[in-house]
Design a protein with these regions (language model features):
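Short, well-ordered beta-strand elements
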Residues: 28-52, 71-77, 144-148, 174-176
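Conserved C-terminal helix/tail region of periplasmic/extracytoplasmic solute-binding proteins
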Residues: 312-358
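Short helix-initiation/N-cap motifs at beta->coil->alpha
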Residues: 75-87, 100, 168, 173-188
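Secondary-structure end/capping motifs
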Residues: 41-42, 238-322
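A ligand-binding cleft/hinge motif common to bilobed small-molecule-binding domains
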Residues: 98-110, 160, 192-212, 304, ...
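Short, polar/charged alpha-helical segment
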Residues: 40-72, 110, 162, 307
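Pocket-lining segment of extracytoplasmic ligand-binding domains
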Residues: 176, 182-274
Length: 358
């Protein structure tokens, strides 16, 4: 055989192998990796208190792609909360995630290419629980005491704002960086004096092992926490149609979670995370479901994120300015609201916190 024929044969084999490899790759399912900046009791792969938690427990995304065998949904819940989600985005291991305001702003400041697609878990209250017989009755009593919070989370930023409003800073406290499970154990054993958090602390108080002495409920609404569904820019650009369907699924979950007639069923669904239903009931007491589960990127939400960005730098949590221009991407949300007939379902709020007339 001549050399030229050998070369042609080799080229043909290489071409065939290349086509085979490309076909095999094309036949591989698209795995949509979704992160959640929290985890359930005893590391259960569920959470509670947000429409994103509803989407997971109610399998809204799985149902959205049920007739697409080449699309798979994979959830990851992070004990390390928002900072761990940023690592997932940085390593291209996540396509979408539920994440709080501070860690998503930190990600933005450090150059992560993400987009804010819709709100989920916005306007969440924060609680201060204290150990039994600690003598702590109010925020000012925290001075010099051991106080737990999870650094780098939206609860961290909210706690600093609350302290500042009461004449304190982090430096006035002995701050202990603990996750939720560690906080509960330390507070129950009185290894710490107090802690900032939410349902885990409500549950601990219900058992008689701690006392709730403060909540942002009924206080300045800007002390609350915000969160949303964040998307990786490269995935969004490569798969706009898939992104639209992902947002559709989250909006459907938000709609169901906002219907007062579903309140009992909603708490039951969130109970998959291991949080007792009475605790969830207390967490949402006197709050309208539609207020807490709205997906809207309204003026109030945007203004709060801008304020958080400024405060984060002021408090030394972020070293540089955070450019939010172009980060909020309401296109997919607006399409969902139009397609699902939900344009007037949720009440938008202005930057002043007041309802905007429709």
């Amino acid at each position: 055989m001549k050399l030229t024929n050998i070369s042609r044969l080799a080229a043909g084999v290489a071409l065939a192998l290349g086509i085979f490899a490309a076909s095999a790759h094309a036949g591989e399912p698209l795995v949509i990796h979704i992160g959640y900046a929290a985890i359930g009791v005893d590391n259960r792969p569920y959470s509670e208190g947000t429409s994103a938690a509803t989407a997971r427990a109610g399998e809204y995304l799985e149902k959205e792609f049920a007739n697409d065998p080449n699309v798979k949904i994979e959830w990851t819940f992070f004990k390390g909360a928002g900072p761990a989600v940023n690592e997932g985005f940085a390593n291209n291991q996540l396509d979408f995630a539920y994440q709080g305001d501070l860690p998503s702003l930190i990600g933005r400041a450090t150059g992560l290419k993400t987009k804010y697609l819709l709100a989920s878990g916005a306007r969440k209250p924060l609680y201060l629980a204290v150990a039994k017989d600690s003598g702590i009755k109010k925020i000012e009593d925290l001075k010099g005491r051991k106080v737990a919070l999870q650094r780098g989370t939206n609860g961290h930023l909210a706690a600093i704002k609350i302290l500042q409003a009461h004449g304190l800073t982090e430096r006035d406290l002995q701050v202990i960086n603990l996750d939720s499970a560690e906080t509960v154990a330390a507070l129950a054993s009185k290894d710490i004096d107090a802690a900032f958090g939410d349902t885990d602390l409500i549950n601990l108080a219900a058992k008689g092992s701690a006392d709730i002495v403060y909540t942002t409920k009924g206080d300045d609404p800007r002390f609350g926490r915000n969160a949303g569904i964040i998307g990786r820019e490269a995935f969004i650009d490569a798969h706009p149609d898939i992104t639209q369907r992902v947002v559709d699924a989250f909006v459907k979950a938000a709609q169901w979670s906002s219907d007062e007639s579903n309140r009992g069923a909603l708490l039951e669904l969130w109970h998959k995370a291991g949080t007792p239903i009475p605790v969830l009931d207390e967490f949402f007491r006197n709050d309208k479901l539609a207020y807490r589960n709205s997906p809207l990127i309204d003026d109030l939400l945007v203004s709060l994120y801008k304020e958080q960005a400024v405060k984060s730098k002021e408090y030394g949590l972020i070293r540089r300015d955070v450019d939010l221009n172009g980060w909020f991407e309401p296109k997919y949300l607006n399409n969902s609201l139009e397609r699902l007939g939900l344009k007037t379902f949720w009440q938008p709020y202005g930057a002043d916190g007041k309802p905007v007339a429709s």
